[in-house]
Amino acid sequence: MSVELVPVRDVATRAAAERLIREYLEFIAEIALRNYQLTFDIEAMIASDLHDESKFFPPAGRFYVVRHAGEFVGVGCLKRLTPAVAEIQRMYVQPAVRGVGAGRLLVERLLADARAMQFKAIRLESLRVLSPAHALYRSVGFREIEPYNESSMTDYQSRDALTTYHSSAVFMELAL
């Protein structure tokens, strides 16, 4: 069965994006609390993701849901960090459909978009325990870097919590 990327533009794709981002953030929040004693304000993150048009939506960003077998099963976003650097955020494919190529298709599309938007580099951050995702990112050329100040978590964590978050996360970059 085919995997398709659909830009988030209308009521149906926004509803799918909200459901998938919530599912992703709840999954991440459980891991972060259990492993690192970190908490996230999921509602604030979802509100920002879906209602701040300058965050993931064109012209500054890109926002996709993944459709497989007629169902929305994944999400991924591209955000402008600086005029030269973009960031991949909210990359998530539901566990039941991992392995069908949805994650790779999404990453490759976000990289192509970043190149078309003339970014010079693209970054991402991911909890250390999500090693299968890191393998995907490495396979397309990402390399680990030091934590960066433009990280989206600076909007949602205190300075003390950020120190804990930085030690619990992998930060990666790919030169475009």
Where is each model-derived feature located?
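Extreme N-terminal starter segment of soluble prokaryotic enzymes
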Residues: 2-4
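Acetyl-CoA-dependent GNAT
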Residues: 7-89, 94-95, 107-109, 113, ...
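Loop/helix-junction capping segments adjacent to catalytic residues or to phosphate/diphosphate-binding pockets
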Residues: 11-15, 100, 131
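Conserved G/P- and acidic residue-centered "switch" motifs that form tight phosphate/ATP-binding loops
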Residues: 70, 101, 118
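Active-site acidic-Proline motif in GNAT/NAT acetyltransferases
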Residues: 94-100, 128-129
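Short polybasic/polar patches that bind polyanions
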Residues: 98, 115, 138
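Residues forming the Rossmann-fold NAD(P)(H) cofactor-binding site
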Residues: 100, 104, 108
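C-terminal "cap" of GNAT-fold acetyltransferases
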Residues: 120-122, 127-176
